[in-house]
UniProtKB/Swiss-Prot annotation:
It catalyses: D-glyceraldehyde 3-phosphate + pyruvate + H(+) = 1-deoxy-D-xylulose 5-phosphate + CO2. SUPFAM superfamilies: Thiamin diphosphate-binding fold (THDP-binding), TK C-terminal domain-like. Its EC number is 2.2.1.7. Mg(2+) binds at residues 146, 177. Thiamine diphosphate binds at residues 74, 115-117, 147-148, 177, 285, 366. It comes from Magnetococcus marinus (strain ATCC BAA-1437 / JCM 17883 / MC-1). The gene is dxs. Its cofactor is Mg(2+); thiamine diphosphate. This is 1-deoxy-D-xylulose-5-phosphate synthase. Homodimer. Keywords: Isoprene biosynthesis, Magnesium, Metal-binding, Thiamine biosynthesis, Thiamine pyrophosphate, Transferase. One of its GO terms (biological process) is isopentenyl diphosphate biosynthetic process, methylerythritol 4-phosphate pathway. Gene3D superfamilies: 3.40.50.920, 3.40.50.970.
Length: 622
């Protein structure tokens, strides 16, 4: 049976429909997104929440000539459906399939690549200013969630856009669903909630909303002055208008009768405009509406019942970290935990339940999180900042200037280090070893398995110095638990002794290195395997022992430039080992952006699995 949605291969085709058909398009789009994501997994709730908004934006604005930028991009599945990628949606986040975010190389309707939060207003403002500079008449539209709006970068862009940019054709659509990934926190979220619940405000907006649907451009200036005068009598000036934006809303983001006339009037007006729309995350799929955190990023599920397919059943590294941190916090009342709007993703929801007074969700504000932790540390608190490796990049200056330079005891627990799989290049934890090891005073550890993670967390708590431990996404190895203990700083370990060559690995690749040694053993090649444990400081005695093999392969799951291998080469060079004919190679993430796919697929492609490690070492041996 042919659906209406199947006839739409571009926004131009959408705009040819009578607007009375749009609710049918919305229902069919929801069904299609649910069908595809139930098979592939992906970001379900955010995309379901903006179906009507997505359709309305493409119906009113002349995309791709008008620029449409989706903040983060995980709500863009409907956008992909309308822009020629409908039949590929089932491949989303899979190897050689669609990206889970917007991507410039994927479509001309994706003018800006996204993945990290709160970049859309800055990017759209740049596009709007460039259009003016080039003499082009077009709108730049940024769609940003209320969670992302709480980040510093978004406020920086609002501040700039509203200042002396009255001719700027910029529209910011605030998609207010009271969620980022976890429920929103902070004063902005509270402000929006108060504004929505205010009786006088809503009575006023109900009246002005009716006028807005019919107002002409010629009446606008007078109406604006009148609105400001009357509004001042019934409510304080809104935050956004004080920043220099013309504010409209809030309107129902699921109601075409509200969306279309409002967007048409917004399209006619100049200057920076903020349109506030109210949506429900997971709209149209009851399990996602009732459990928005669970269905934010979801594994394949039964589309009829909503039951999510179970994973392998093992314990994740994230959960191992969270459970051990809770155990340590039972003994140490000075331990506090900090997250930047990722309490479930980092496992700190477990900590929050047990120690709510020592748990801090700062919102999407990584820079603030790090300096907030530094302030806590000055007063005898031991803060643990649990953060994805890719988001640690956003607070590098704070890590150096506010933590390391002052030698403050802050623990950075870097989750999703290395290859992350389906989220792709924007979320790869590929750089932390490279940028952290340059910082004086930092101790850096990378566990090979869950027992090592427990040991290293105990070591970090005991150290009383700036320290980072990085661990991968996914299920731990399922090893029998060992009693956790404090490790000697800067000491690695010997896992296997051989005669012909040595593999020196750190972090996740340690166990694949052991498997590679077993493969080579079957071919008559005897290989030693070492676990460095510490990237900084390095175990100099261990390096001397490794170099004595004459043939060395260094393996890490980090960018090969500037990472662990580079540190080993620098140290061996200083020891003079490279002057004595040592054959050494470094394996890691190559100097390119690794696309999305499963971790197993990606490790196989770049040679960071057991077979790839064995093959590389055999080639090195000649």
């Amino acid at each position: 049976m042919t659906t209406l949605l199947s006839t739409i291969d571009s926004p131009k085709a959408l705009r040819q429909l009578n607007e009375a058909k749009l609710p049918q398009v919305a229902q069919e789009m929801r069904d299609h997104i649910i069908e595809c994501v139930s098979q592939s997994g992906g970001h379900l709730g955010a995309s379901l929440g903006v179906v009507e908004l997505t359709i309305a934006l493409h119906y009113v604005f002349n995309t791709p000539d008008d620029r449409l930028v989706w903040d983060v991009g995980h709500q863009s599945y409907g956008h992909k459906v309308l822009t020629g990628r409908r039949d590929q949606l089932a491949s989303i986040r899979q190897r050689h399939g669609l990206s889970g975010f917007t991507k410039r190389s994927e479509s001309p309707y994706d003018p800006f690549g996204t993945g990290h939060s709160s970049t859309s207003i800055s990017a759209a403002m740049g596009m709007a200013r460039a259009a003016k500079a080039n003499g082009i008449q077009r709108k730049a539209v940024a769609v940003i969630g209320d969670g992302a709006m709480g980040a510093g970068m978004a406020f920086e862009a609002l501040n700039h856009a509203g200042h002396d940019n009255h001719d700027l054709d910029l529209v910011v659509v605030l998609n207010d669903n009271e969620m980022s990934i976890s429920p929103n926190v902070g004063a902005l979220s509270s402000y929006l909630n108060r504004m929505l619940s205010g009786g006088a405000y809503n009575a006023f907006r109900d009246g002005t909303g009716k006028v807005l649907k019919t107002i002409s451009r010629s009446m606008w200036d007078a109406a604006k002055k009148a609105e400001e005068h009357v509004k001042g009598l019934v409510m304080p000036g809104t935050l956004f208008e004080e920043l220099g934006f013309t504010y409209f809303g809030p309107i129902n983001g699921h109601d075409f009768d509200a969306l279309l006339p409002t967007l048409r009037n917004v399209q006619k007006l100049g200057g920076p405009i903020l349109l506030h729309v109210i949506t429900k995350k997971g709209k149209g799929f009851p399990p996602a509406e009732e459990h928005p955190c669970t269905y934010h990023g979801v594994a394949p599920f039964d589309k009829d019942t909503g039951i999510i397919q179970s994973s392998s059943g093992g314990t994740s590294y994230t959960k191992v970290f969270a459970q051990e941190l809770c155990a340590l916090a039972e003994q140490n009342p000075h331990i506090h935990a900090i997250t930047a709007a990722m309490r479930e993703g980092t496992g700190l929801n477990l900590f929050e339940k047990r120690f709510p007074e020592r748990f801090h969700d700062v919102g999407i504000a990584e820079q603030h999180a790090v300096t907030f932790a530094a302030g806590l540390a000055t007063e005898g608190i031991l803060p643990v900042v649990a953060i994805y490796s890719t988001f640690m990049q956003r607070a590098y200056d704070q890590l150096i200037h506010d933590v390391a330079l002052q030698d403050l005891p802050v623990i950075f627990a870097l989750d999703r280090a290395g290859l992350v799989g389906a989220d792709g290049a924007t979320h790869a934890g590929a750089y932390d070893l490279s940028y952290l090891r340059t910082v004086p005073g930092m101790t850096i550890m990378a566990p090979a398995d869950e027992n090592e993670l427990r040991h290293m967390l105990h070591t970090a708590v005991a150290l009383n110095k700036p320290v980072a431990l990085r661990y991968p996404r996914g299920t731990a190895l399922g090893l029998p638990p060992e009693p956790p203990h404090v490790l000697e700083i800067g000491r690695g370990r010997t896992l296997r002794k051989g005669e012909h060559a040595a593999i020196l690995a750190v972090g996740q690749p340690v166990h694949p290195a052991l498997e590679a040694a077993a493969i080579l053993e079957q071919q008559g090649i005897s290989v030693s395997v070492y676990d460095a444990r510490f990237v900084k400081p390095l175990d100099q005695r261990l390096l001397q022992e490794v170099a004595m093999h004459g043939v060395v392969l260094v393996v890490e799951e980090n960018a090969v430039q500037g990472g662990f291998g580079s540190a080993v080469l620098e140290s061996l060079s200083n020891q003079g080992a490279l002057d004595r004919g040592l054959k050494i190679r470094c394996m890691g993430i190559p100097d390119r952006y690794i696309p999305h796919g499963t971790q197993k697929e990606l490790r196989g492609e770049i040679g960071l699995d057991a077979v790839g490690i064995a093959t590389t070492l055999k080639e090195l041996l000649g």
